[in-house]
A protein has these predicted regions:
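Non-catalytic, C-terminal membrane-associated alpha-helical segments of glycosyltransferases
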Residues: 237-293
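Conserved donor NDP-sugar-binding/catalytic core segment of glycosyltransferases
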Residues: 93-127
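A short, conserved alpha-helix in the catalytic core of glycosyltransferases
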Residues: 163-224
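Short, flexible, basic/aromatic active-site loop/helix in glycosyltransferases
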Residues: 131-170
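Short, acidic, metal-binding catalytic loop of nucleotide-sugar glycosyltransferases
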Residues: 20-30
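Short aromatic/hydrophobic "clamp" motif used to bind/position activated sugar donors
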Residues: 82
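Glycine-rich, basic loop-to-helix element that forms the pyrophosphate-binding segment
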Residues: 45, 59-77, 98
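A conserved acidic beta->alpha catalytic loop
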Residues: 12, 21, 35-45, 62, ...
Length: 293
């Protein structure tokens, strides 16, 4: 059985649409849905049960964030397989069953993620490589990857350099859809998802921890879901969230590489590149009211 865990925080309509899509499209596998409400104030979470009476509703008396909320849901889960699914996603087919088949047939898989699109149909960059000095330099000086053959560039860089049109192993996956075996948590610190981050970049941390334990993470292009992305955040908050994510990514690199010369060189390159881009995006937002993704 698959236990699908969804976190709700003041996104009642988005969450209801997500739940509706799960119950509509999931046909080939037994499943349960656990909804963790992170102390929402927008509406009584008990209203979800009016439309979804089979739902397991878990109420938290405070906002535990993404990792903390999922750990709370996992404690209530009965499945051998766990799916973390963002509340601002919608299934368009039986993506859970398709992903489960991949998890069960591939060897030594940590997490399985799937292809995602924005509501307008544009693909999201959900399969990525871990950050490194070489990756940051190639991303900064884009004429370098431009000189590579297209397939080589896509596989080496992933992210925005990859069309997400084929399934492959990757370093880390977007946490909006993460399927894994419950047994994987037995190998994790404290036998749970690492919750040192309240929100943002925790998916990268978990994928790194799975890799350290001999697992690989797999991007599945055979099924697609819709992901609003930051559905519970305003546009201004999204820009602020990016800065938080960058700080967390630096903390992850520090964990992996330590505080030696590699970390400091990386921080200079990464900081210059990402903070400059964020400043441009903020300036553009001030002028137009629109966010560059």
């Amino acid at each position: 059985m698959v236990s699908v865990i969804v976190i709700n925080y003041n996104t009642f309509e988005l969450t209801a649409a997500c739940l509706r899509s799960i119950y509509t499209y999931t046909r080939e596998v037994s499943f349960e849905v656990i909804l963790v409400d992170n102390a929402s104030t927008e509406r009584d979470p008990g209203d979800f049960l009016l439309e979804f009476p089979l739902l397991k509703l878990v109420r938290s008396d405070k906002n535990l964030g993404f990792a903390g909320g999922n750990n709370l849901g996992i404690r209530q889960a009965a499945g051998d397989h766990l799916l973390l699914l963002n509340s601002d996603t919608e299934l368009r087919e039986d993506s859970i069953s398709i992903a489960l088949k991949t998890l069960q047939t591939k060897k030594a898989v940590g997490f399985v993620g799937c292809r995602m699109e924005y509501p307008n149909g544009r693909v999201q960059y959900t399969a990525r490589r871990f950050r490194s000095i070489s990756w940051e330099l190639m991303d900064l000086f884009r004429f370098i990857p431009a000189l590579m053959p297209a397939e080589q560039r896509a596989e080496r860089m992933l992210g925005k350099y990859f069309r997400h049109d084929r399934s492959l192993e990757c370093d880390w996956l977007n946490g909006a859809f993460l399927l894994f075996e419950r047994a994987l948590l037995d190998q994790f610190p404290k036998k749970k998802l690492d919750d040192r981050f309240f929100m943002y970049a925790e998916d990268q941390l978990w994928c790194e921890q799975a890799t350290e334990r001999g697992r690989h993470n797999y991007f599945l292009a055979d099924t697609t879901i819709v992901h609003v992305n930051s559905g519970s955040s305003s546009i201004r908050q999204q820009l602020s969230n990016r800065l938080t994510m960058y700080r967390h990514e630096l903390a992850i690199l520090k964990r992996r590489k330590g505080l030696g010369i590699y970390y400091w060189i990386f921080m200079v390159i990464f900081g210059f590149k990402e903070y400059a881009r964020n400043a441009i995006k903020w300036f553009y937002f001030q002028l137009t009211g629109r966010l560059i993704r």
